[in-house]
Amino acid sequence: MILKSFLLGNLVSLCMKIINSVVVVGLYYGFLTTFSIGPSYLFLLRARVMEEGEEGTEKKVSATTGFITGQLMMFISIYYAPLHLALGRPHTITVLALPYLLFHFFWNNHKNFFDYGSTTRNSMRNLSIQCVFLNNLIFQLFNHFILPSSMLARLVNIYMFRCNNKMLFVTSSFVGWLIGHILFMKWVGLVLVWIRQNHSIRSNKYIRSNKYLVSELINSMARIFSILLFITCVYYLGRIPSPIITKKLKETPTTEERGESEEETDVEIETPTTEERGESEEETDVEIETPTTEERGESEEETDVEIETPTTEERGESEEETDVEIETASETKGAKQEQEGSTEEDPSPSLFSEEKEDPDKIDETEEIRVNGKEKTKDEFHFTETSYNNSPVYKVSYLYKNQENFNKIKILDKKDEDKGLFWFEKPLVTLLFDYKRWNRPLRYIKNNRFERTARNEMSQYFFYTCRSDGKERISFTYPPSLSTFGEMIQRRMSLPTLEKLSSDELYNHWIYTNKQKKNNLNNEFLNRIKALDMGFLSLDILEKSTRLYNDTKKDYLPKIYDPILNGSYRGTIKKKFSPSIRNKISLENFIETMEINKIHNLLLPDTDYQEFKQKIDPFDKKKRFSTEISHLFTLISKFDRESRSGLNLKGPSLFSENEAKLLKFLLNAIITIANGHKIKQKSFGIKEISKKVPRWSDKFITELEQQTGVIQEGVRVGHQIRSRKIDDIVVFTDNKWNSKNRDKIDLIYTIEYLQESDFRRNIIKGSMRTQRRKTIIWKLFEANAHSPLFLNRRKKSPLFSFDISELMKLIFRNWMGKGAELKDYTEEQTKRREKQEENNIKEKVRIELPEIWDLVPFSKTTRSLLLIIQSMLRKYIILPSLIIVKNIGRILLFQPPEWSEDFHEWKREKHIKCTYNGVQLSETELPANWLTEGIQIKILFPFCLKPWYRSKPKLRPSYRDLKKEQKKDDSCFLTASGMETDLPFGSPRKRTSFFEPIFKDFLALRVLIRRTKHFLQGSKETKRGFIKNVLFLFLKRIKKELSKVNPTLFRLKEVYESGETNQEKGSIISNQTIHNSFNKIRSTDNYSPREKKIKNLTDRTSPIRKKIKSITKEKKKGTPGIKSSPNKRSYNVESPKDIWQILKRRNTRLIWKLQVFLKIFIEKIYIDIFLYIINIARMYTRLVLESTKKIIQKYKYIYNNETNQETINKTNQNTIHFISTIKKSLYNIRNSKKNSHLFFDLSSLSQAYVFYKLSRTRVINLYKLRSVLEYHGTSFFLKTAIKDSFGTQGIFHSELEHTKFPSYGTNQWKNWLRGHYQYNLSQIRWSGLIPQKWRNTINQGRITQKKNLTKWDSKDRLLHYKKQNAFEVYSLPNPNKNENSQKYYRYDLLSYKSINYERKTDPYIIYGSPLQVNNNQRISYNYTTQKQKFFDILEDIPINNYLGKGDIMYMEKNPDRKYFDWKIINFFLREKVDIETWIKMDPNSNKNTKIESKNYQKIDKIHKNQIFYLTLYQDLEKNPLNQKKHLFGWMEMNQEILNRHISNLELWFFPEFVLLYNVYKKKPWIIPSKLLLLNLNRNENVSDNKNINGKQKWNFFRPSNEKKIFELKNRNQEEKEPADRGDLGSDAQNQGNRRFVLSNQQKDIEEDYAKLVLKRGKTKKQSKNKSNVKVELNALLKQHLLFQLRYDEGLKQRMINNLKVSCLLIGLKNPRNITVSSIQNREISLDIMLIRKSLTVRELMKRGVLIIEPIRLSVKKDGQFIMYQTIGISLIHKSKYQTNQRYREQRYIDKKKFDESTPRYQRRTGNRDKNHYDFLVPEKILSSRRRRELRILIHFNSRSRKGVDSNPVFCNKKNIKSRSPFLDESKRFDRDKNELIKLKFFLGPNYRLEDLACINRYWFDTNNGSNFSMLRIYPQLKIR
């Protein structure tokens, strides 16, 4: 057995080795290449088929030999790089294939072309045989075309990179190809033989009848092959980048508005007069003097060089008449153009800036003859650098314009020097200009930038790089970097580091890391020691070195500072207004053009020397060229005005000699041979950077052109091909106008044609043949996709391979215990079926016009049919029906109804519509209706009725009106004469003429049957029936008489009711006696009917008893409550009455319903009564408690206005209390509904675990004390709490246990298990975990109890306790004043849990999950004004919170704030004062008066303001009121938005529901404080400039007022210190606000200036339009992510309005149709009020525009938690500062300190810019150095103990000895220190599975591929 397995294993391994061997892979690859059939196969087959005889055999041999030789060369090219470059480039196809194919095409058609006669002496001298050989050889080198060769080429590249024995691979692949080729040729030969010998083919009738067909076929074989060759030729013609077929777009010299990223040309033509330059043009590098004066437009395309006539010409719109454009072929990939000054205006030049010409300009002189006069024009310099070490090319490609210039002559000096190869460069650039649109590239427009970046191919490039000290293969290595490295290696001798072995390299890496770590550690310790010695902390802090500008006496801006990197180089946008730019002299704008010295290394020496000789007179002084090149490349681009005066603060950057040299270079004037002067004003050094190429053209689509996109008043041609569209004329204004007689105004809409879109926005002239693999399997494929997206498309049943539904059906019982399938009620199933049916109908309706479009002339036929049907219906069919009906009535002796019928017939109108249903008019047909098709809409369709009502009702009832509304007043006519509701819809049923007649007959028939049944029945039934009829008849008479004489009949009714009661009582007593006697009777005597009644009574009696007992309990349980918890009334009739009603019914019905009744009553008992009892009890208790607390609060505040010490005790905010009530009620009410939000999280990743750990207090029983001593009514047993001890792993602990626990393995695991399901909020979990997964987990876990829904497990019990108890924030006893100064400065929850035993009676304050008692901060009111250095952490739980800083990559002061409680003030102070807004300043007096406006209810909402609190209005009930959409983002959820306010939740406090619910659901996304203010900032800017100390900044502003709203409810004594706090210590924030406003004002000025310029040119735009545009631009500029959208419902209603308006415009008397349209809601009147001149603000007010939220944080929930995890070491101030005015006044230089603020602090905290809480010593170092230190500690930890050996955090003794400042307060107990250690050094010491966090955070990278395999597991142990 062992032997067998051994042999089997060896066999498998042997097979694997063989399969993976190089030979087998090569054979496989070679066999694959057999199927890559190229054009050479045509020649090979031609030789096989056509040639016969001796010469034919020789040709076959030569063809095969050439074929194999060519393939061998292809395989050799795989191994031999130069051959591969030659054959693998498109040059080969262009140079070889096209001429050769064309030559063969002509040769085969002219047989005598090469016919020299046959020479049989030596067959090899025969030219035709040699040609056959050459054909097969050369054509084999061409690219294959039947199977794409790219796949095989990639296979080769990958395998060549992998395998070692490359030559063996090449040889084996050739052998494989040879085998495949031989097999293929043998198969072809067999097929030919079979065709010749097959009798069935010969005996074919067609072949026999055409005797000469076979001979003709053989004779025309040459022609067939020549046709095939021609097709191949055309195919290749399409694939090459040829300039002949593809269209080169003319680059338009339009003066574009470009925003902030505009660029300028490098060549500036200096004139005797000062040039007027455009707004944002930069200085140029070379000034060339010319005698002409030129005014230039705003921005000139770099690749356009316009040569102007001698006359002065303003460059404007129509320049093309006077310009000749010399279009340059741009650089290929190697030459990347540098940006000059765009970084100053655009922080990301690689994305948003245009291409510039290369700085390496080569002179070129053009001599231009204009109208016979010779004139020397400007010199232009262009370079063309090839990809890899090719010579430098120049461009001399001209675009000739014969209209303006007779002769253009270009004298090219350099070309003359080059000699024979002068043609080389123009030819290559002509054929291979990569900037031409001859590739199917998309032009993807950005919303902000019109020009677009080119879509380059993705760079998958294999190269070796070092990672973690080892050589690794990187597949995303930038190829430009590798070629750059190769160039450098050829030019310079680099250190021979690569010769070292990998182990030596790794050791070297470890050594350098250790050195770095030691240096950092030493520096760190030195700084801490200096702190211990008492130095100022700001001197100890590490500050980054900054570049200093001596001339300006200021630091260089961070964005330009080369020393700073990473996040410091943020985005700064500098803008200059046009007036300032015009004033600044051109001398400051001019930059010189100087060669980047690094090109000395890259370019070939000859060219470089030639260049130096041409432009550099200092050529002989080569001694400094290389030195300066090294020096200059170190320096980045500096500020343009002070390039010569840059110094580091400290030692000088340049030595004296270098400084002289610089000065000499900077002020040099270079003279060129032709006498022009080039002034070098300054020296600009350029960084080597890769630049994303950007198209210089601004393209528009076909659609934009047709819709009238105008560029500076000139309608330009489109360059992007859109989907085919048709213009449908809606309305033609034919009114004759004396001024414009020829002008006819057309109003038209655009319609897409029903055909596949193969254009797909491709640029004109781009190649089509390369767009392969588009599949079509429908009649109409709107978007042709490749099969790659097949799985994302809606599959047809034939192609759907999804068996998941089948698997669910089969294995649904295996899906886990308790999984339940949803029970659909009958109504739901019906609704679903109806929905499916409607979907099918809609699909058919859409596909029908597609079928019509496919059939030729179908639209014409259908249009004619419709018109015929319309005429027939209107004038023949309907009148004839009317005549027949009325004749029939006359014959039946009925009065005829001619007038009524013809009146209805006249009402019917046939409206001609467009093909899509846009109504035009009754008489006018749309233009081109025969070709494009029409629809005919019938208004008020005539329906023939047998009779009309004789007397119409005076007042129609509501039901009748509803019926009339439901009745459709319009339909469309089909080609078959039927009616349909929608165009191409299914025909609808017509109301039958005979239906009402049959109804009457049916009623008669039923009456006859009933009477017959009545007559045949028994006497008893007759009597009962007569009695009932008489009783009802008498009752009706009595009612009528009681109206006449009410008093008499009321007395009678009272008397009768008494009698009936007596009768009832007697009946019941008789019944009971009868029942008791019945028990004695024998059962045999019963009739079947009596048995049924007895059984029924026996079953129902216990049910009745139960119902009675329940109602009694209910009455006892809720004595004082009359209303139910939710606003529905449970008016259930008493069971007695129900029984009486049922008893009166027929016994058959009772018998059927007995089971149902039982189930129904049990349901009522379970679902309603117990629920009501429990809810009612809870609410009564809570209401009583709340009223008690509110009364206490009012009393206390009234009595203690000036008593400062007792404020703490009274500081219970009712909103906190209410929120706790609401939270508990919400949990109880929604625990069943939201139970899917809490679940078992066994698969949670470590990041979430550590997030939880960072928020958890010490694991001791202090916190459980509050659970045990919870003062509310407990719904739990003590045993459950004891059980929970075991789950936390602390069952063995005792209450007095205060020692900090050691975290071994067991404690770690137990700790993770017992953390309350990682207490994140419900909202957070719902965002993190997919909904379906949650549902499946929870289906089996929900357990119910009658009084409480208890969820999941014992841990959830603790979670509930935690929700009720741990949101209770405790304060110390206010009598102990000496402790209050300390305790308020750290975390209240931590303090409570740690020091619980030492405090006897902590005061409970109820806290909201969203808020914290910021008023507790009052006790910062120190007796002595001693400034504390550090604030201890206030670690408020952030369950439902995301702050501004939590959003990744946000700047410190964005225009949007993300939920700071400061922002809510704009909302609450204006509308509602819920909290006591108390503010105490540290510097204020103790006896400061505090005025608080408490518990003011919701004020009346002012209708003149934008903000409306209509969030909870039901959309269906309020369809016309669109105001609720304005702030719909508050809820973020449409379902919540649609919920009505009459929800069960929180109905006791309706005054708080609106405010609380808005912020409770998803509070982290709130619009900017300036959002609404900026909508009307034209009015506000001037007002907001002067914010003095007394004014408050309000975030909210009424729309019709022009002053800033001042805050109320503050007295003056409080206001002054508050103002100091607001505008003094917070001066920076205020400054930022002013800065924002001033910037916005500048933006508006710029926008207006641009508009004025435009208006001066076009003179057509109206003022209103410009105002709207300015407002919109201002709004879009502020909100970087575009958030404006319009309401979808509004869009549909506007379309409906348009359709009806089109009809009404064409009607002479539109009144009737207008009224009916309004009644049918086809016209929305509220939309018609929207004027064209409405501003953005008004549109938002009306609900037309909606502000969308930025959902960054919601999408990045997981990332947010990761960042929270990593930022544990960070101590930040409370994010929940509700009191906006409070600021602690600090005396530390903010500017200097901000420099050392790490990036992630902006994510997680420090939003007040008070970064002074340095409890963690690591913050001494800068962020980058801190990261370095941490990661080095990890990488170099050989032993696990080394991880924890950071000297600062070893143990308490070390902390005391080394760093006493940590323990500055001796009152800190040991537990507190241990807690600080845990929380603030958890960062670098925890286990982290999700190392993407480390990757993003520590290394400033976003690419996680390098770290995917890395895992760090330090031991979590603090000794």
From Swiss-Prot:
One of its GO terms (biological process) is protein transport. It is found in: Plastid, Chloroplast inner membrane. It comes from the Eukaryota. One of its GO terms (cellular component) is chloroplast inner membrane. Residues 259-269, 278-288, 297-307, 316-328, 355-366 have a biased composition (Acidic residues). InterPro entries: TIC214 (IPR008896). Involved in protein precursor import into chloroplasts. May be part of an intermediate translocation complex acting as a protein-conducting channel at the inner envelope. This is Protein TIC 214. The lineage of its organism: Eukaryota, Viridiplantae, Streptophyta, Embryophyta, Tracheophyta.
